Amino acid sequence: MAGYSIIHVSDVPDVSGDYPGAIRMATEHIGAEQVALTYRRMAPKTGGKGSYGHRHRTQEETLYLISGTVEVKLEDEVIEVGAGTIVRIAPATLRSVWNEGPEDAEMIIVSHRLVDQSNEVETVDGFWPE
């Protein structure tokens, strides 16, 4: 097996179902052993607003916004970030992302890979009420 992998994001299945946009979890498809990588495209007026927030037990997350503008809610603070912005989020920090803008927003989410994610995520309903 080669010491590298190359794939196109369009070759990674979209797991968003009927939800607008796309969520493509590339980790297994690229054969990553240490890094988790997800591509997310958020349609306008989508995300976690009016819904739940989440935190992790062990995973630090890094968001890199490729295009568009989103609101990131971190605990009680809402921060608007634009393309080219990188946001690091500690595991225990409650978080949610919302695309308020008129166009799609694209981001890459990076964290460390977990084999067993069964107890990793805690969700909090009503975190970002409308």
Label for each model-derived stretch:
Residues 33-35, 43-48, 69, 113-117:
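Short, charged/polar surface micro-motifs in flexible loops or helix N-caps
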Residues 40-43, 55-72, 110:
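Short, conserved beta-strand element in jelly-roll/cupin
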Residues 62, 69-71, 78, 94, ...:
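Structural motif
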Residues 1-36, 43-44, 120-130:
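A short, N-terminal "cap"/entry segment at the start of jelly-roll beta-barrel domains
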Residues 72-73, 89, 95-101:
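Short beta-strand His + acidic residue motifs that chelate non-heme Fe in jelly-roll/DSBH
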Residues 27-36, 47-61:
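A short beta-loop-beta micro-motif enriched in histidine and acidic residues
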Residues 98-130:
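Double-stranded beta-helix
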Residues 76-91:
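Short acidic-glycine-tyrosine-enriched beta hairpin
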